[in-house]
Amino acid sequence: MDLSVENGGLAPGFRFHPTDEELVVYYLKRKIRRKKLRVEAIGETDVYKFDPEELPEKALYKTRDRQWFFFSLRDRKHGSRSSRATERGYWKATGKDRVIHCDSRPVGEKKTLVFHRGRAPNGERTNWVMHEYTLHKEELKRCGGEDVKDAYVLYKIYKKSGSGPKNGEQYGAPFIEEEWAEDDDDDVDEPANQLVVSASVDNSLWGKGLNQSELDDNDIEELMSQVRDQSGPTLQQNGVSGLNSHVDTYNLENLEEDMYLEINDLMEPEPEPTSVEVMENNWNEDGSGLLNDDDFVGADSYFLDLGVTNPQLDFVSGDLKNGFAQSLQVNTSLMTYQANNNQFQQQSGKNQASNWPLRNSYTRQINNGSSWVQELNNDGLTVTRFGEAPGTGDSSEFLNPVPSGISTTNEDDPSKDESSKFASSVWTFLESIPAKPAYASENPFVKLNLVRMSTSGGRFRFTSKSTGNNVVVMDSDSAVKRNKSGGNNDKKKKKNKGFFCLSIIGALCALFWVIIGTMGGSGRPLLW
């Protein structure tokens, strides 16, 4: 194959650019083994007989690439040392030799040389660079000998654009647009009716090495017979639009079902909103975010729609009581389980039993002293007497709020037992809460003593002492000061009493002497 420009050459972008591995394993190895190369791109030239400027003319191919390849015989001057001198200069090795690998095995060696003009060692360095490729010793043994076949060496020569390393520099042929201007006149004429054969046609004709441009009349008739045997359309003319061959298919059953669903949605009436949705939609229609007086008009009808017969009694009292009792039963079991795992579980039965009388007495005094009554003027509802602690003997109940004007203090009501059970469950739930009082005043028996002290007056101080029964001792401020001062206070009081007596005696003596002086001056006798 000829790569010269005079014989047609290559299109722009196509160039001879083999890698180091390809140069050694394919080109150099086949040259040493006297094998034929598929492309004769590298000629045989003695590179040491010519200067670098003369070597491009000796290249086998003429593509104006700025790098050239040559096969050359190794000229040995002193044993294994090669002679690298030319008529006007010499090639000097630079850098380290590199080993070329193929499939993780060494196949060759690469040496870099730079041309120096003049005589060694005072030659002038130039920009001409040459890579010398030799076959590795192990690879030579695979070739069958080392006598004559190792004499061939492959050289790649190029010229750098300047001094120093030029990594990434390209050495391909420069592109000249004018050289390819004549190709614009060569128009390609497409036939009006060009046959496009589908991929499913048997390619036995192409297996014979025939090209599409080499078909004769017999081949065309055989091809047409195969096309007719194929199922479906396999031919298309250029004049026919490609849109005709593209047909979209739909499933008619699915299409009819979708149309029926759309029509059914249009014919069916919209669902009516529930009472809860009506309440939400009617409230805050003005967009202000506040409730108006009109929002509460007709509330009875809304509660009736929700299933409540008497919104004033059942919704407020019955639902509240029953719902709270149900939730209390559920929460009591949960809180009891948590209380068992809390630190209050460590208390002994004796301490717990000792705390109950104090708490019961405290709650009994509060409940016996007064009852809680709250008057709701706006709604006219009255709530009286909440339940007491269990075990006190006092009965109370949780009354339902009813409209004003109806008496609600019926203590002999048959539901008395139910309210007592309810109060007992409430106290059981409160006792199961594992909460420690945040302040001393929140403790029930401490608070009871505070109430008693507030009535008697004076200030008291709580002092904790480590006693056997863990009793909190309360002392007044005067008692604490008295304990601190000790016997010093008694001595001061005795001194104060003596001084007070002396002052009284002195006053009496002074009064006596004043009387004596007065009576003696007037001439009256002192004795009556």
From Swiss-Prot:
InterPro entries: NAC-dom, NAC_dom_sf. Expressed in roots, rosette leaves, shoot apex, stems and flowers. GO terms for cellular component: cytoplasm; endoplasmic reticulum membrane; nucleus. Induction: By heat, salt stress, abscisic acid (ABA) and methyl methanesulfonate (MMS) treatment. One of its GO terms (molecular function) is DNA-binding transcription factor activity. The chain crosses the membrane at residues 499-519. Keywords: Activator, DNA-binding, Endoplasmic reticulum, Membrane, Nucleus, Stress response, Transcription, Transcription regulation, Transmembrane, Transmembrane helix. Residues 388-419 are annotated as: Disordered. Gene3D superfamilies: NAC domain (2.170.150.80). Residues 10-160 form the NAC domain. GO terms for biological process: mitochondria-nucleus signaling pathway; positive regulation of cellular response to oxidative stress; response to red light; response to UV-B. Interacts with RCD1. The NAC domain includes a DNA binding domain and a dimerization domain. This is NAC domain-containing protein 13. The gene is NAC013.
